């Protein structure tokens, strides 16, 4: 079975197709069923200066039918996960290298989100040997109040996942990429099992990885002395970095964490 697979999972109208179309550039809609998006696959080729990689975006939707009422979505997700963790799905699980869980943030319920994140945590434990990345991606059909978005992001972070709001783009106050730009960055910086180096030496590729990692944390503690971040801001940033570290391979974590510690100590 092909490797380099990303599972894109979520309920109806939560952005699964929008994510897949953005990453793949495939906006054809004739093959998309009105009843369910499960089973769709988008193929894409990601290219950077140093490598290219073929990636499959595997779409799964719960419940099985869009006619099911929303109050049954949690039980439908539990049923889906029960099938996913079964022996018959072992071959598929072995080739999953990333999971994008999609949610609609127009009207979200703390209790529902928590139950979904609990199931996602079980999935993370199930796939831990693959060392996949996990992203919770939110979409909205209208503007969301900043406080509401911050509450949702905090809830996701406290459960050990990174939250990305699809409608965003550009960079935040920490100079971290946001929204679509962050989603693309996650895929471009992941250590894919099968990739093709673009006529560069391994040393150049390792230098590229180091440069990418540095740029992802640029601005963490680079403010002028007159504009030192507050403790709340630093704690929020620490939560974001914790989520990033959890997605790294074991041999990458120590150096990255050591660098973070040194930078944080400059403030104390």
Curated annotation (Swiss-Prot):
Q: Which UniProt keywords apply?
A: Chromosomal rearrangement
Question: So which domain of life are we looking at?
Answer: Eukaryota
State one Pfam family annotation: Adaptin_binding
Cystine pairings recorded for this chain: none
Among its keywords, does the record have Membrane?
no
Does this entry carry the keyword Lipid metabolism? no
GO process annotations (BP): vesicle-mediated transport
Q: Name one GO molecular function term.
A: protein-macromolecule adaptor activity
InterPro entries given for it?
Irc6
Family note? Belongs to the IRC6 family.
**Which PANTHER family does this chain map to?**
INCREASED RECOMBINATION CENTERS PROTEIN 6
Described by its record, this protein's role is as follows: Involved in gross chromosomal rearrangements (GCRs) and telomere healing.
Q: What is this protein called?
A: Increased recombination centers protein 6
> Lineage from the top down?
Eukaryota, Fungi, Dikarya, Ascomycota, Saccharomycotina
In the UniProt record, what gene is named as encoding this protein?
IRC6
């Amino acid at each position: 079975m092909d490797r380099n697979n990303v599972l894109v999972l979520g309920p109806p109208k939560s952005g699964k197709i929008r994510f897949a179309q953005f990453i793949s550039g495939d906006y054809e809609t004739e093959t998309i069923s009105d009843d369910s998006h499960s089973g769709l696959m988008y193929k894409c080729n990601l290219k950077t200066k140093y490598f290219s990689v073929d990636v499959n975006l595997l779409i799964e939707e719960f419940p099985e039918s869009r006619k099911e009422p929303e109050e049954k979505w949690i039980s439908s997700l539990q049923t889906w996960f029960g099938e996913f963790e079964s022996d018959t799905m072992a071959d598929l699980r072995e080739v999953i290298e990333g999971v994008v869980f999609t949610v609609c943030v127009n009207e979200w319920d703390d209790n529902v989100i928590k139950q979904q994140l609990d199931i996602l945590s079980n999935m993370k434990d199930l796939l831990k040997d693959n060392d996949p990345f996990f992203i919770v991606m939110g979409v909205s059909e209208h503007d969301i109040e900043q406080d509401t978005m911050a509450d949702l992001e905090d809830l996701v972070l406290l459960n050990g996942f990174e939250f990305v709001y699809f409608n965003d783009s550009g960079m935040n106050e920490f100079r971290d990429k946001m929204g679509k730009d962050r989603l693309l960055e996650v895929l471009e910086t992941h250590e894919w099992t099968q990739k093709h180096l673009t006529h560069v030496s391994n040393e150049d590729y390792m230098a590229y990885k180091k440069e990418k990692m540095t740029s992802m944390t640029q601005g963490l503690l680079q403010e002028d002395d007159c504009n030192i971040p507050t403790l709340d801001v630093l704690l929020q940033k620490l939560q974001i970095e914790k989520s990033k570290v959890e997605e790294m391979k074991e041999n990458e974590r120590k150096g990255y964490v050591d660098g973070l510690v040194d930078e944080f100590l400059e403030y104390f």
